[in-house]
């Protein structure tokens, strides 16, 4: 049994082994419905989620597990139940894994210290979203074979993005160079010390990127003065058709979703030939099956 609380702490060989295992879970692969037959996986989501919760649900069912879907709406949390009490009550139903999303950074780490089953972080505050980073890396490996020597440009609200943090750790561990790009107000200090290159000039960074990952701009950031306007953001950092033409041959466009069309990505780019966004979604089920398999072994 092993927790997946973040990418930090996982060695390159461990990440590659998990990603290699995910290939067996792609459509057309061997039958895996026996791996967790008779077991229960609990989805414990304190934040709304469509893609991640559905993907983990499908992953668990594909391994033969029963799935307990818990959401905060109408739960005892609204009556004052603590996080640990909720987690312990869920654990008492006998799951082999708790897949957990929470608004507070570090919440899955706290739960992992107090339960005996595997805890899988499905996103905690602005800290990490490890399964998203793994499916992103898997998507690129399927295209390239290896990430060694590749350059991945991550554009947008890095400051508040758990996806960016997990991807930085994962991509660097797998041999890629990571460039972070965005307005100064949305790039946290210390990125260079984690191995990232930092730029505020998207047009200068685009031509050398093998993949461009656009992050969702949370529209409330404009009200909090992180952005002058979404129109200004799109002008400086949005990936439109003109900018797409400056990308190198074979470079791909990624987005963790949901997309603000016309802000981070022009519709023609999001739906264009370079886009692997739907591949990311479909690969997510295979990667999350591998995560459940590895963490519950």
From Swiss-Prot:
Amino-acid positions noted as binding carbamoyl phosphate in the UniProt annotation, renumbered to this chain: 51-52, 101, 129, 132, 257-258
Family statement drawn from the similarity comment of this UniProt entry: Belongs to the aspartate/ornithine carbamoyltransferase superfamily. ATCase family.
Keyword Ribonucleoprotein: no
Enzyme Commission number, as recorded: 2.1.3.2
Organism annotation: Myxococcus xanthus (strain DK1622)
Chain sites annotated for binding L-aspartate: 79, 162, 216
Upper taxonomic lineage: Bacteria, Pseudomonadati, Myxococcota, Myxococcia, Myxococcales
Catalytic activity of the protein: carbamoyl phosphate + L-aspartate = N-carbamoyl-L-aspartate + phosphate + H(+)
Gene3D superfamilies tied to this protein: Aspartate/ornithine carbamoyltransferase (3.40.50.1370)
GO cellular component: cytosol
Disulfide bonds: none
Protein name (database record): Aspartate carbamoyltransferase catalytic subunit
Quaternary assembly: Heterododecamer (2C3:3R2) of six catalytic PyrB chains organized as two trimers (C3), and six regulatory PyrI chains organized as three dimers (R2).
Matching PROSITE patterns: CARBAMOYLTRANSFERASE
Pfam families to which the protein is assigned, alphabetical: OTCace (PF00185), OTCace_N (PF02729)
GO BP annotation list: 'de novo' pyrimidine nucleobase biosynthetic process; 'de novo' UMP biosynthetic process; amino acid metabolic process
InterPro entries reported in the protein's UniProt record: Asp/Orn_carbamoyltranf_P-bd, Asp/Orn_carbamoylTrfase, Asp/Orn_carbamoylTrfase_sf, Asp_carbamoyltransf, Asp_carbamoyltransf_Asp/Orn-bd
Function in brief: Catalyzes the condensation of carbamoyl phosphate and aspartate to form carbamoyl aspartate and inorganic phosphate, the committed step in the de novo pyrimidine nucleotide biosynthesis pathway.
Gene Ontology terms, MF aspect: amino acid binding; aspartate carbamoyltransferase activity
